[in-house]
Amino acid sequence: DGHSHLMASNIPNCVSYDPTFAYEMAVILRDGMKRMHEKKENIFYYITAMNENYPHPAKPKDADEGILKGMYLLKETKNKGNTRVQLLGSGTILREVIDAAEILSKEYGIDSDIWSVTSFNELRKDGMETERWNLLNPDGKKKKSYVEKCLEKREGPVFAASDYIRSFSDQLRPYVNKPFYSFGTDGYGRSDTRKNLR
């Protein structure tokens, strides 16, 4: 559809995720059951899962918090080059991001930090809440959004990709203090196969 997560972002009590791996889905479902049924929070979930077959790795250590907040560091490529980029991907496109990191490393000597973004929407919510707090507390210590904390000590421009239109990942632009480029499936209807789409 290319835009359903953007529609979900307009509903305040909708918690939406676009996970890639089975362990991400498990963490999200467990937390969702706890919040909705045990804590009785007035929320509901919108979770997208794709119909592609691919290997699912083991869950990285200490990934749970990042999975629920919206992003976590999945992998770093290490070369002897001086150039580094931040690659953000969600859903099935994360696998394309991982492949892109390999190409950048092997063919161009560019290192990458690969981030799995389970929810651009939750990251945006956190960014907006942080912005609001800073606006209402001008004399207090300025807070930083979760995405700012993740990326502030990382080098290089940020490239964000998803299986949705560019404006989905572009929601992070105000909270990233680095050159930011978003990629998506704009023009989806013109692609006859998944290979051509990607």
Language-model region placement:
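Thiamine diphosphate
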Residues: 1, 9, 16, 24-28, ...
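Ferredoxin-type iron-sulfur electron-transfer modules in oxidoreductases and energy-metabolism complexes
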Residues: 21
